[in-house]
């Protein structure tokens, strides 16, 4: 997706007849837009505005509005919030100095993330040993499924740890734009392994149901061991999930998702094994099948989510609006028009492409300074990995890049 602005209708201008000769002044524009927006709101919404924090208006609870009206006002509020974020960002970046306290907090956070990964890996080793013993003692296929899950947890944890280490060591001559894409690739491999496990368990459980061969019932001692090991494993995974879920690191959050998944599979596996032992044998493989389906659906979704991030999907309109506003604010009066603002995923973060029109007689030195400062500001945004700013003296031309639909045959 891209946003195109021709000279006849420059961005944020409401006066079409003045568009060719006048570009809107953006200084104080957010305040003006906020005032106009709130002044035009229906009375039923204006009465709910908090004077101290008007942008936190909860439109969803407003009575008497249709759903599409609520959606419209929510989008307008979100746009105003994003513009305010840009203003705050520009103000902070202009005053920014290296803060030793911030650097220390950043180092502490990275250390905490590495600790979370290491604790998760050691916990997976310990739990695998416990579950192997529980499987041998109980003979339950549902517990065996949970044990296989722990085995793959250990393997997948190794993949994520390798991914983390690989991202830290970058040869800029071999990988000139870094190795951030290793992260979604590692998560895809991790999720694919987990989904494969689910399919394998599904086959084994279905085979046991079809063959109609019930497993032997567990005695009192076996049940005690089963309860002790599975409940301990569940408690450990629950603590790890709580510890990891608040992290901002995507790899640590992948660990957190796995820990949450293990809590669910451990509880369901234990319930299925105990009920099968007490009542009907087929409850055990049935529980294993349910776990397998949950595994396949859960991790297949993770595969698709990360795969999409690697194929260049466009940023949503809200992000494009925010970027466009930043371009107009940062560029100053020398930018005649914004021709294109394009943002797309290339891993976790966005790549941004901007085409702007500058005066034809502007000296190269000044034009370069405008483009470079705009690129730097765009790349300072937390959601942007890399920005490309193209300078032109007119915007009436064909697209400068073609989109390939096939791979050339000579490659």
Curated annotation (Swiss-Prot):
UniProt key word Cell inner membrane: no
Protein family per UniProt: Belongs to the cation diffusion facilitator (CDF) transporter (TC 2.A.4) family.
Bilayer topology annotation: Multi-pass membrane protein
Vacuolar side: 137-140, 206-222, 284-287
GO cellular component, one term: plant-type vacuole membrane
Subcellular location as annotated: Vacuole membrane
A biological process from GO: iron ion transport
Key words, A-Z: Membrane, Transmembrane, Transmembrane helix, Transport, Vacuole
SUPFAM superfamilies: Cation efflux protein cytoplasmic domain-like, Cation efflux protein transmembrane domain-like
UniProt GO molecular function: manganese ion transmembrane transporter activity
Cited Pfam families: Cation_efflux, ZT_dimer
Intervals, Cytoplasmic compartment: 1-115, 162-184, 244-262, 309-390
Gene responsible for this protein: MTPC3
The name this protein goes by in its record: Putative metal tolerance protein C3
PANTHER family in alphabetical order: METAL TOLERANCE PROTEIN C3-RELATED, MITOCHONDRIAL METAL TRANSPORTER 1-RELATED
Annotated function: Involved in sequestration of excess metal in the cytoplasm into vacuoles to maintain metal homeostasis.
Database matches in InterPro entries: Cation_efflux, Cation_efflux_CTD, Cation_efflux_CTD_sf, Cation_efflux_TMD_sf, CDF_Transporter
Transmembrane segments: 116-136, 141-161, 185-205, 223-243, 263-283, 288-308
């Amino acid at each position: 997706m891209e946003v195109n602005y021709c000279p006849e209708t420059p961005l944020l201008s409401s006066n079409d007849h003045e568009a060719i000769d006048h570009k809107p002044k953006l200084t104080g524009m957010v305040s003006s837009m906020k005032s106009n927006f709130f002044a035009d709101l229906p009375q039923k919404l204006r009465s709910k505005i908090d004077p101290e924090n008007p942008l936190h208006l909860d439109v969803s609870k407003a009575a008497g509005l249709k759903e599409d009206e609520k959606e419209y006002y929510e989008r307008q509020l979100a746009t105003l919030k994003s513009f305010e974020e840009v203003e705050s960002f520009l103000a902070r970046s202009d005053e920014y100095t290296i803060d030793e306290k911030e650097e220390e907090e950043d180092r502490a956070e990275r250390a905490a993330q590495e600790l979370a990964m290491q604790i998760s890996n050691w916990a997976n080793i310990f739990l695998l040993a416990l579950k192997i013993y529980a499987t041998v003692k109980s003979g339950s296929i549902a517990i065996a499924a949970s044990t296989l899950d722990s085995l793959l947890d250990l393997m997948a944890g190794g993949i994520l740890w390798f991914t983390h280490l690989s991202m830290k060591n970058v040869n800029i001559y071999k990988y000139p734009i870094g190795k951030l894409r290793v992260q979604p690739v590692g998560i895809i491999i991790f999720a694919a392994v987990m989904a494969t496990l689910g399919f394998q368990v599904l086959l084994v459980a279905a085979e046991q149901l079809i063959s109609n061969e019930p497993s032997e019932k567990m005695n009192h001692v076996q049940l005690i061991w089963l309860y002790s090991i599975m409940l301990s494993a569940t408690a450990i995974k629950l603590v790890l999930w709580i510890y990891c879920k608040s992290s901002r690191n995507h790899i640590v959050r992948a660990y957190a998702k796995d820990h949450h998944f293990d809590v669910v599979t451990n509880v369901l596996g234990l319930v299925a094994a105990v009920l099968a032992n007490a009542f009907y044998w087929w409850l055990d493989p049935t529980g294993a099948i349910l776990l397998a389906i949950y595994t396949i659906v859960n991790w297949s979704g993770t595969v698709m989510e990360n795969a999409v991030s690697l194929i260049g999907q466009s940023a949503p309109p809200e992000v494009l609006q925010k970027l466009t506003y930043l371009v107009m604010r940062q560029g100053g009066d020398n930018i005649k028009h914004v021709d294109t603002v394009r943002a797309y995923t290339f891993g976790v973060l966005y790549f941004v492409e901007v085409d702007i029109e500058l005066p034809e007689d502007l000296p190269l030195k000044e034009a370069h300074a405008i483009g470079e400062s705009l690129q730097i500001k765009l790349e300072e945004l937390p959601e942007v990995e890399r920005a490309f700013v193209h300078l032109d003296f007119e915007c009436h031309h064909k697209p400068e890049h073609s989109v390939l639909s096939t791979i050339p045959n000579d490659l």
